Design a protein with these regions (language model features):
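Conserved serine DD-peptidase/penicillin-binding transpeptidase domain
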Residues: 1-315, 399, 422, 430-439
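Small-residue-rich helix-loop
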Residues: 32, 274-277, 281-440
Length: 440
């Protein structure tokens, strides 16, 4: 039958080191979790799969992108698609090195290499000292990546990230490659199995975990066959085509391998410290799933709205269409943001939330800001950045030890982002200095 790898929303099937400390660290290979699962399958004694290798992400509704996301974001890591079967933040790495001589084609490769993407390499090696200029493009729905430009002799090379349009299909292809390296024969195709959208899931999703959010962070990615293998049988018999119904691990499936995620609290730090959009979107789906919506945008946003109203925000102070803030149609006022931060500070989980925020001059998205100023270590805040938009909201402490909450939004500006950030940072230094900056 088919061999199915089922995603349950774990965002950290990658080489990311957890818990997060100061900066993102990755331990190669970033395929290690899938390598371990492939080892489990090999140890099970399986030798042949007569059916297909299927990447199944039906645990969440099939809604890869949110309303209001810009088309030019979708090719890159910031706009990586949402999938219950997520690998490596749903990006591949494109490695580029210069050739041996000026005029030679550059050396390019995809990491991990699975044969899923075709590279059209038009990058030429230029003379030493010439500025590197590289362009990368993938059309929506295409598996050809076009690369062009120049890279000079002696250049150390570059690693670019490119979003994977169908993560479930990519994981299926990658896992097939790992199984074949272990001597397992695959006779069928490689494909993805998606759900039929939010409405389908509202009616049909199987709530396989009855748990609160912290317990449900141990979501698993498991391999299961849709028919049990007989005792001593080292092959999976052929089966009927899959119709796209929600998949789950049940008595009719034989589990060959499984992996459990790290605690959800670890990923909250990743989301807030590094502004990890995809992980924020997956957290939104998890909230919706636990509220019985089947893991849809709509269900997650409904739960968030209920929470915000409970926190004291007014209905006309916010509109959200995604979990990351990437949508241009997300709206919220600075006053509402301050109200939310005050509410959070008074909750039992408030201290943990504040600790998950970037620290000025120390880590995350604020590591390089406030350097050599009294504000270093005194600001715990979340950044927000889109083209023509910059924001900073969070908690601060003055030189006299007074704590304060703040939210600064700069919208629809046409200035270099560096100048806007400098202005925001100047405001923060005044606040941290008890308003003394600039006084004589």
């Amino acid at each position: 039958g088919d061999l199915v790898i089922i995603g349950r929303g774990d965002p950290n099937i990658s080489g990311r080191v957890l818990p997060y400390a100061l900066k993102t660290q990755r331990t190669p290979p970033h395929t290690q979790i899938l390598e371990d699962m492939a080892d489990q399958v090999a140890r099970s004694g399986l030798k042949t799969v007569d059916g297909d290798v299927i990447g199944d992400d039906t645990y969440y509704a099939f809604e890869r992108y949110a309303e209001g996301w810009a088309l030019d974001d979708l090719q890159w890591s910031d706009g990586a698609p949402v999938s219950a079967l997520t690998f490596n933040d749903n990006v591949v790495f494109i490695n580029v090195l210069p050739g041996d001589r000026a005029g030679d084609k550059a050396l390019v490769g995809v990491e991990p290499e699975t044969g899923y993407y075709e590279l059209d390499n038009r990058i030429v090696t230029s003379a030493a000292g010439v500025t590197r200029r590289i362009g990368i493009h993938r059309d929506p729905g295409a598996k050809k990546i076009v690369l062009w430009g120049t890279i000079p002799l002696g250049d150390a090379g570059t690693k670019e990230t490119l979003a994977i349009e169908d993560p479930a299909e990519f994981v299926a292809q990658l896992f097939r490659t790992l199984l074949e390296r272990r001597g397992i024969t695959i006779r069928g195709k490689t494909r993805a199995r998606h759900g039929e959208g939010a409405q389908f899931f509202v009616a049909s999703a199987v709530a396989s975990q009855q748990a609160n959010v912290s317990e449900a962070s141990a979501q698993d990615s498991a391999l299961a066959t849709n028919t049990p293998a007989a005792a001593g049988d080292n092959s999976l018999p052929s089966s009927a085509p899959v119709q796209g119904t929600p998949a789950d691990i049940s008595s009719s499936n034989k589990v060959l391998a499984e992996h459990f995620s790290t605690p959800l609290a670890d990923d909250i730090r990743v989301i807030n410290k590094t502004s990890q959009n995809l992980h924020a979107e997956l957290a939104l789906r998890l909230v919706g799933k636990l509220r019985g919506s089947g893991g849809s945008f709509e269900g997650g946003i409904a739960a968030v709205k209920q929470f915000l109203l409970q926190a004291g925000l007014k209905d006309d102070e916010f509109t959200f269409l995604d979990g990351s803030g990437l949508s241009r149609r997300d709206l919220v006022t600075p006053a509402a943001t301050v109200q939310l931060l005050i509410y959070a500070s008074r909750q039992p989980w408030g201290a943990a939330f504040e600790e998950s925020l970037p620290v000025g001059g120390v880590d995350g998205s604020l590591a390089d800001r406030f350097q050599n100023t009294p504000a270093v270590g005194q600001i715990h805040a979340k950044t927000g950045s889109l083209s023509h938009v910059n924001a900073l909201s969070g908690y601060g402490q003055t030189a006299a030890g007074k704590r304060f909450v703040f939210s600064i939004f700069c919208n629809n500006h046409n200035m270099p982002g560096s100048k806007v950030l400098a202005a925001i940072d100047s405001i923060m230094q005044v606040l941290v200095g008890d308003g003394q900056a600039g006084k004589k």
